[in-house]
């Protein structure tokens, strides 16, 4: 199943959580926090303004992003957990 987001929505795959702390302690699955970083896997066509024009999104497929802990709606597609969120829920793009 493929999810094609509408308007200013973005589909994000969470990046894997770090399972060790900085001091080397291994965290069990329940203790590890869900990461607040992900990779954009699909983007909508853009937000429609009051004048009817469409503003393209600033993020694109493949971008690594940072988002809020409670951002987006969790959905499952082909057994994979994804997030669907608005572009305004994204804090920034991680650049290398």
Curated annotation (Swiss-Prot):
One Gene Ontology term of the molecular function aspect: protein folding chaperone
Protein purpose: Together with the chaperonin GroEL, plays an essential role in assisting protein folding. The GroEL-GroES system forms a nano-cage that allows encapsulation of the non-native substrate proteins and provides a physical environment optimized to promote and accelerate protein folding. GroES binds to the apical surface of the GroEL ring, thereby capping the opening of the GroEL channel.
Gene it is expressed from: groES
Source organism, top-level taxon: Bacteria
SUPFAM superfamilies on file: GroES-like (SSF50129)
Transmembrane stretches, start-end: none
Location(s), subcellular: Cytoplasm
Recorded GO CC terms: cytoplasm
Protein name as it appears in the record: Co-chaperonin GroES
Family note: Belongs to the GroES chaperonin family.
PROSITE patterns documented for this protein: CHAPERONINS_CPN10
Keywords: Chaperone, Cytoplasm
Subunit annotation: Heptamer of 7 subunits arranged in a ring. Interacts with the chaperonin GroEL.
InterPro entries in alphabetical order: Chaperonin_GroES (IPR020818), Chaperonin_GroES_sf (IPR037124), Chaprnonin_Cpn10_CS (IPR018369), GroES-like_sf (IPR011032)
């Amino acid at each position: 199943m493929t999810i094609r987001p509408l308007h200013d929505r973005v589909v994000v795959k969470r990046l894997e959580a770090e399972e060790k702390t900085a001091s080397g302690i291994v965290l069990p699955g329940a203790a590890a926090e869900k990461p607040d970083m992900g990779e954009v896997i699909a983007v909508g066509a853009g937000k429609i303004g009051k004048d009817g024009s469409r503003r393209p999104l600033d993020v694109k497929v493949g971008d690594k992003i940072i988002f809020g802990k409670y951002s987006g709606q969790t959905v499952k597609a082909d057994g994979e957990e994804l997030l669907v969120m608005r572009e305004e829920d994204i804090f920034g793009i991680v650049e290398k």
